[in-house]
Amino acid sequence: MNRGLLERLFDLRGRGTNVRTELIAGVTTFVTMAYILFVNVRFLGEDGAGMPDEAVFFATAVAAGVVSLAMGLFVNVPVALAPGMGLNAYFMSVVLGSGGTITWQIALGAVFVSGLLFVLLTVTRVRQTMVAAVPPSLRAGITVGIGLFIATIGLKMSGLMTISVPPGHAVDPAKGGVLAGDAFLPALGDFIHRRDAQLALVTLAVIAVLMALRVRGALLIGIAVGTLVGVPMGVTDFSALGSAGWLPDFDRLAVGALDVKGALAVGLIDIILLFTFVELFDSFGTLVGTLNRAGLLKDRKQGERTVGRAMLVDAAGVSAGALLGTSTVTAYIESASGIAAGGRTGLTAVTTGVLFLAALWLAPLALVVPSAVTAPALIAVGVL
């Protein structure tokens, strides 16, 4: 594809940018987002919601790649998308907390329906009324609550914190896994004897230092360093790479495995609505914040049209992601890193999308990265 075609397709000159800057911005965005390839496997995979690890990695990479490409080509904005943090954690809790009544296939069906509802709200412009009706304090509360939820899961997965059920308080599957009596006992993990907890501390320290130094891709670099440090500690096992191919096992994919009928039959209306409303507010806030930083909302009417089209792609991406086999796909605030690097057009998002598709070759690495390494990334994201 020649530069002239890219110029016409993305209006590079009109937005004061060039091909080189957009490509660098796309790579920057990918580096800051790529941690989701490994973290999502821990949430939805065999150690989380019970899906095949290869299926989750495939769905994460393809959904992020395809929907980011759509955002870049159809809306021409430098915003990339991928399965969102927070809603993937909620997805896991819905499956694990149901006592076996809600399978991951049914949960995917709920995500698919929420995406269709999101599309309907966007097309009918009801979303504008809904967003305006929610007070800023409630929006902030939702964000903080999701962050604490993610951080708590990260602390538990890493072994830095344990949660025990006190005597007389049993888990009640009929109440979605909520402890009867609404009680649980958090405590510090065993740092002395548990190597995974020690590795999690080291990884968290590396991520914290890199973030303090404003290093782009701090989470991805931290995951890589933690994985290598885990080898002499006996936590990371690279032996699986010897028998693994450099592409996912296509016989274990979850494409089209969602159960929409089951989701509606079980009566997951409250869960579907929660998915929808969190998607709506999260998407709107991220898009307005990133596009404003890119200088694409200066003209009010044009800005409203741009945000509306971007939210439509985001909404369609939710259902597309569920069809592929992953939790809610949403716009990523990490897109701001690419914008800071000069990204102003959809070419940035297209570049990021292509890199996510190319990342399918990294599938075996997702299987060897231990949860003690991905968990600190959850803690960092939750705190932020």
Show which residues each predicted segment covers:
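Structural signature of hydrophobic alpha-helical transmembrane segments
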Residues: 49-62, 102-116, 164-168, 187-199, ...
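Active-site cofactor/substrate anionic-group-binding motifs, chiefly glycine-
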Residues: 48-98
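Hydrophobic core segments of alpha-helical transmembrane domains in multi-pass membrane transport
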Residues: 25-41, 60-72, 92-93, 112-122, ...
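Membrane-helix interface "capping/anchor" motifs
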Residues: 69-83, 209-220, 340-346
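Helix-loop-helix junctions within the multi-pass membrane cores of secondary transporters/permeases
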Residues: 2-36, 40, 84-93, 97-143, ...
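Helix-loop-helix hairpins and the membrane-proximal interhelical loops
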Residues: 1-57, 186-189, 221-308
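Helix-loop interface residues and adjacent transmembrane-helix termini in multi-pass membrane transporters
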Residues: 50, 76, 101, 123, ...
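Inter-helical loop and helix-membrane interface segments of multi-pass membrane transporters/permeases
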Residues: 45-53, 93-107, 128-139, 148-208, ...
